[in-house]
Amino acid sequence: MTTQSEYDYIIIGAGSAGNTLAARLTEDAGVTVLLLEAGGPDYRLDFRTQMPAALAFPLQGRRYNWAYETEPEPHMNNRRMECGRGKGLGGSSLINGMCYIRGNAMDYDGWAKEPGLEDWSYLDCLPYFRKAETRDIGPNDYHGGEGPVSVTTPKAGNNPLFHAMVEAGVQAGFPRTDDLNGYQQEGFGPMDRTVTPNGRRASTARGYLDEAKKRSTLTIVTHALTDRILFEGKRAVGVAYLVGDSDTRIQARARKEVLLCGGAIASPQILQRSGVGPAEVLNKLDIPVVHDLPGVGQNLQDHLEMYLQYACTQPVSLYPSLKWWNQPAIGAEWMFLGTGIGASNQFEAGGFIRSSEAFEWPNIQYHFLPVAINYNGTKGVQEHGFQAHVGSMRSPSRGRVQVKSKDPREYPSILFNYMASEQDWQEFRDGIRLTREIMQQPALDPYRGREISPGIDVQSDEALDQFVREHAETAYHPSCSCKMGTDEMAVVDGQGRVHGLQSLRVVDASIMPIITTGNLNAPTIMIAEKIADKIRGRQPLPRSTADYFVAGDKPARGKPLREISHQA
């Protein structure tokens, strides 16, 4: 298999965090790294993962998607809901929507109030966001110019619906912001995307591994499914894994550390299979307990969202691009020029608002899309249309991940427990009603047709709740299932080191104590950049001195240009 079976570090999972660690650790001369990935390579000629506008395709099938399903969700009509996770070099950055959103400064300041997490404040994290990024319009106090992640900003001349939707949000009384990752996240504005200057998906495989794999000290094994982490006493000493369809377990040893970067579903699963987790779960499955750690797989969080869809009265939406006869020309322009519809994820505008003054920072996120279709490419509305994705950001609901057997090929039991709190329902009711007010503003008068979904007959609390139960979907942001902290349910410390064990860290979205306000790819890369310096024994980057917006006692909303009354 591999000639050498001992390495300084073994990284499990070549996703957004794992690839970042692999690249940074091998910058140090002589440091050897084994990077294990259960999926395959990120084939550069496969338009499904490389063309931004094709983002729905890799979610279909199982080549690039683990395609997990939840247990029946009790507050969602007992639906088994999708839980897509990336499989292949790049992990979920190979199949995500490419929205580059870092979260709100207050998310990180909130983490830093927890004992042991004092150095996770926004100004401590900002230098690592900048380190990871190359933004196409150049660096500033908030953005980087030399990092491995290519970030593309929306350009003049893009779809007029993006501008109309942002204007409508401002006319509805909400703030405007020119950069959702800059001084002020709160408000409506253009949304950056992780796309290269020539219109390709900027996954972490492209950004970090393309450089790192030139180094002889990095060994990458694809189709390598981790069975378990190997321990001697309380010290992690290696990994046992399977390659392809083989049942032969290959062992590799780590001289320094094992770094678990499987993401919020796989990391707790691998820990539990390795004997690290709630003892009662492990005992039931006859898994020998290495360390009883009750928080492994608990505290699971996600973002739930739904779409409001409208007909478009002018032929400016992307509806024609869904027709097969128009797609060859779109594909050719993208392939040869790196431009056109294919070069964008089409989420070029969005926003963050507070649905009430009860929230210190935004609790609702919008993505605007100039076509009416399901995120996974199904159920396209057969006419010109547009939609707003709306969802709550910091639900109090908590779920869990549990292994069902010792077999590494068996999927775990996943329950998010979506919409378990009254706050969830109130936020979604408010979110839908506020979206309708935004959509009725003058900026959308030239374009707005009838409301396709939910439909104008869906007005009462009960009707809205029923719509959410039946139609809300995951935003694909699972996180927090191996949280950082010092309390009895924390799994790792502020450097990702697993409590009670030696030489083992978890570095991915699972270690977030509380989910961030927005998409999770950029924060996951930042977390890995920050912990990479800890592993390497380097001084942390100097704290930023940039200003950032805190709402304080500012109202969540001003007077709308056009007042809209809600039917009860």
Curated annotation (Swiss-Prot):
GO molecular-function term, one example from the UniProt record: betaine-aldehyde dehydrogenase (NAD+) activity
GO cellular component: membrane
Superkingdom of this protein's organism: Bacteria
Catalytically driven reaction(s): choline + A = betaine aldehyde + AH2; betaine aldehyde + NAD(+) + H2O = glycine betaine + NADH + 2 H(+)
Keyword Cell inner membrane among UniProt keywords: no
E.C. designation(s): 1.1.99.1, 1.2.1.8
Keyword check for Chaperone: no
Active site: H477
Cofactor: FAD
Enzyme class: oxidoreductase
Residues reported in the UniProt entry to bind FAD: 8-37
Known pathway: Amine and polyamine biosynthesis; betaine biosynthesis via choline pathway; betaine aldehyde from choline (cytochrome c reductase route): step 1/1
The entry's keywords: FAD, Flavoprotein, NAD, Oxidoreductase
GO BP terms in the entry: glycine betaine biosynthetic process from choline
Annotated function: Involved in the biosynthesis of the osmoprotectant glycine betaine. Catalyzes the oxidation of choline to betaine aldehyde and betaine aldehyde to glycine betaine at the same rate.
Family: Belongs to the GMC oxidoreductase family.
Name listed for the protein in its UniProt record: Oxygen-dependent choline dehydrogenase
